[in-house]
Amino acid sequence: MSDKPDLSEVEKFDRSKLKKTNTEEKNTLPSKETIQQEKECVQTS
């Protein structure tokens, strides 16, 4: 066996068989207001 990967499958891959998908952001970052509120809550405790 060689250390090099077999690229024959990659070379003949047909991109037209892929279907388009819509990505959706699942892990949104908190807003600045939310971060500030959490900081204030932690400081007062």
From Swiss-Prot:
PANTHER family: THYMOSIN BETA, THYMOSIN BETA-15A-RELATED. Neuroblastoma-specific. The lineage of its organism: Eukaryota, Metazoa, Chordata, Craniata, Vertebrata. It is found in: Cytoplasm, Cytoskeleton. It comes from Homo sapiens (Human). InterPro entries: Beta-thymosin, Beta-thymosin_sf. Residues 1-45 are annotated as: Disordered. This is Thymosin beta-15A. Residues 1-27, 35-45 have a biased composition (Basic and acidic residues). The gene is TMSB15A. Keywords: Actin-binding, Cytoplasm, Cytoskeleton. It holds the Pfam family Thymosin. Induction: Down-regulated by TGFB1. Disulfide bonds: none annotated. The keyword Cytoplasm applies. Plays an important role in the organization of the cytoskeleton. Binds to and sequesters actin monomers (G actin) and therefore inhibits actin polymerization. Belongs to the thymosin beta family. GO terms for molecular function: actin monomer binding. It comes from the Eukaryota.
